[in-house]
Amino acid sequence: MYHSRLFLTNGVISVELDSLNGEVLGFIRESTMDNAAKNYFRDAAGILDGIVYVDNAAKHLNVPRFPQISEDASLTPKITLEQGEGSGKAEIFYPYLVANGEKIDISAKVRIELLPGDCRSRWYLSLDNKSGCEIQCCKFPQLNGLWLGDDWKENTLIIPRVAGLKMDDPTGTLAEPPVRMTWKWQEYLHNYFLGSQPATKDDRGLYEMKVNHTGGCSMLWMDLYSEAEGTGIYITCRDRDLRQKAISACTLGPYNPGVGLGIDHFPCLTEGAWESQECVLAFHEGDWHWAADEYRVARQENPNPVCDNEPVPEWFKKSPGLVAHYDFMYQGGKVVHTFKDIPALYEKAKSQGYKHLLIAGWNDHGFDDGFPLYRPSTELGTEEELKTAIADIKADGGHVCFYVNSRLCNVGYPQNKERTEKSCAMNRDGSLKIENYGAKGVDFATLCMSEPSWRKQLVEDITYLVKEIGIDSVYLDQLAMATSVLCYHPEHKEHAGDPAAWNQGYEKLLDELRAAVPECPILYEGCCDVFGSGVAAQLISTIRRPAVGAMAEIYKYTFPEQILTDMLNPRRYSAMRAEHTARKSTWLLYKSFVIGSYFWCYDLEEDNTFSRDRSQEERMRKTVALRQAWLDRWGHGIFRDREDLLVAGELVKKYDIENGVLIACAECPGYPREGNNVVLKWNRSKKVKITMLTAENLTPVVKKLKVKDGFVRLNLPQTELALFAVEEL
């Protein structure tokens, strides 16, 4: 008997497969009877979608479909189903795949498992390459045309891009024409996207957002959910090796709706066998918090032995933030401050509530120019002047951090020629990977951290800065923000035959740094779970994406014990940042406060400083003081987002603390007040002690309340910032 579809179920999830080629035609949550795979993307094959290089030309690698199979029966896959009592397994063997529709000698085996009573489906892929062509990347599993419920516009997609990106109506949003503006600062032309983060349209008409892990992608999962339906779809790869991968979301747009979700692997396989690690597609109730909880548990079961459990110094835990000075030597040799200015800059920071300075542009040829020439610039003063200034700050209980770029090598300096040739990441065609920042003609080679001599030099340079110059923290720019790359350099023996070893190089760097200077906390740009538990703080830079759905709560909730740092910006005199960013100055400040971020306060003379914006400086000073009181009295706490908060605005967040919870509240001027109360679900005691602090009054106001009907109601004072500690009695 002919069956057009093959069915697999465990009573929780059902999967429907095309009986001819094994593609997924149905992905169903049985409790709602909703098939999420509602639209078949005709021109974009599902289940497996890769790139293979044939005669050095990139071609789409897919499973064969009816037109190819009808012409060549040897392409017919063998599909085996095992339907048990409350469980099921499918195995699909493809003797050949197709590259741009043409048969290629690459076989694939797909295995799908549904375990009893489990909302998670497990997916596995193995490849055998006999073609002699390189399989560079492979998206698996790839399910297309997804939406939940009746209306795709009511769906929301969570992508952990730089801590988190929330995208309503992803079908429409991914296909929107990008709205871009340019802001000029010095010789930098900063591009900002407004309204949505743009996707890239490929030759099949697919709008795709692809983010590498590491490099933009903070965690290896996505979640598509519908608040109207109360359900969601979660996708991840349980990546035990933490190798370079990517997540991607795609659509054909609102006139051909639905979203595709996939995990990108990078086999870089020219011959032989390759196997994926376990991937998961799951249905769940509720919103993205289920997905974050699920991912956290899986990562805790698979800790990174290189980067996990790095102790953060007590001084850093008690510090509210730092003041960042990029205005020593700018690109092109423009000098604002010298080493003799450091004591005065520290005193100014102290007046704002900070005792931690970050200094960039301290090195030969300055910021965004003299990389990696990491010795103090003699144009800024003597080494002794620098040492003395730092020693005096430390004697006062302060701290100094130096900016170091972990990625770039200026190709314009003759002394960098050998480093460039030896350590630069190389494209597949043998060309060097080159990047540009700032002025036209200032070009940088992208250095491969899996090249040992570069890693050794960087560790030695930072060790010198700690042991000789006296800094007690270091910031590694671009480490987890700039995209990871594939390196095909034939002389990089440490990762020979493995172009996708980017993450492993940085794991080794951080491990070697901690061994060399264990007393020096590490901060870096970007945010990624591969390295995050092994550093003091991760810079998320919401300031660059305030208008495109940036949502740092996603990472903070998933890994609440890790410290995020975020940039603050004055309302006026914001030459460094665009006007639409400056208009969100207070929102950025208060958002950083309620999610417990380590403040990153710029102080660039005339270009970006709170000291010329007196009213906003006073607002920041009060916020920093309240944050300091929070840390001194309760510590960081464990971030729980809006858990158990039945009535609360966007800028109200909950933390677990010893013997109770802490609630951080903010009201941003210019935004509508979201009510006068916060209602907390409480079943821990019949009475509670409430301790309140505000930005205007750091003296605790304490009262005791009876718990009524399992709830605690907090009346918000007429103030912009407040903290409530609710503790059991």
Regions found by a protein language model. Give the residues of each.
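Acidic (Asp/Glu-rich), glycine- and aromatic
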Residues: 102-104, 117-191
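Aromatic-lined carbohydrate-binding/catalytic grooves of carbohydrate-active enzymes
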Residues: 320-460, 467-473, 479-492
